[in-house]
């Protein structure tokens, strides 16, 4: 009796017909994938991507060399050298380096910064061919900040109620 039931099932291709209708149900739904290099998905305002140093609107860098980001970094990826005090009593950095090979993108540096100088921006496309290109110096970080300032400021404004 079991062989008769199996023969009838295989004769009418029960599994094939069931799989076909299952495929057709998903065939007409909206696609869930994107064509990545040409299309990009939405990125959250809290996304932690490539690091950037920000400037004030007058062009002066925000970093006050307090070294809180260097102290809180669990991967010890940040190195800061502070310059001498200026006439107005403030300090600025002489050297600000981030070893992106060590960085774990935890965002602690951004949370610790009292003046929002170091931020993790929206850029996630910064692959390199050599490890040396992943050692960001102050000039590269400031350049990133200048390039992404509009989006960084918008993301910080959106996230401000939760900070």
Swiss-Prot record:
HAMAP family xrefs: NDH1_NuoI
Domain 4Fe-4S ferredoxin-type as annotated: residue spans: 53-83, 94-123
Entry note: cofactor: Binds 2 [4Fe-4S] clusters per subunit.
Any single GO CC term annotated in Swiss-Prot or TrEMBL for this entry: plasma membrane
One of the GO biological process terms: aerobic respiration
Compartment(s): Cell inner membrane
MF-aspect GO terms: 4 iron, 4 sulfur cluster binding; iron ion binding; NADH:ubiquinone reductase (non-electrogenic) activity; quinone binding
Protein name: NADH-quinone oxidoreductase subunit I
UniProtKB keywords: 4Fe-4S, Cell inner membrane, Cell membrane, Iron, Iron-sulfur, Membrane, Metal-binding, NAD, Quinone, Repeat, Translocase, Ubiquinone
Lipid bilayer topology: Peripheral membrane protein
Catalytic activity: a quinone + NADH + 5 H(+)(in) = a quinol + NAD(+) + 4 H(+)(out)
Enzyme class, first EC level, given as a word: translocase
Annotated [4Fe-4S] cluster 2 binding sites: 73, 103, 106, 109
Family membership: Belongs to the complex I 23 kDa subunit family.
InterPro entries assigned to the protein according to its UniProt record, in alphabetical order: 4Fe4S_Fe-S-bd, 4Fe4S_Fe_S_CS, NADH_quinone_OxRdtase_chainI
Binding site for [4Fe-4S] cluster 1: 63, 66, 69, 113
Oligomer and partners: NDH-1 is composed of 14 different subunits. Subunits NuoA, H, J, K, L, M, N constitute the membrane sector of the complex.
Function: NDH-1 shuttles electrons from NADH, via FMN and iron-sulfur (Fe-S) centers, to quinones in the respiratory chain. The immediate electron acceptor for the enzyme in this species is believed to be ubiquinone. Couples the redox reaction to proton translocation (for every two electrons transferred, four hydrogen ions are translocated across the cytoplasmic membrane), and thus conserves the redox energy in a proton gradient.
E.C. number(s) listed in UniProt: 7.1.1.-
Cofactors required: [4Fe-4S] cluster
Listed Pfam families: Fer4_7
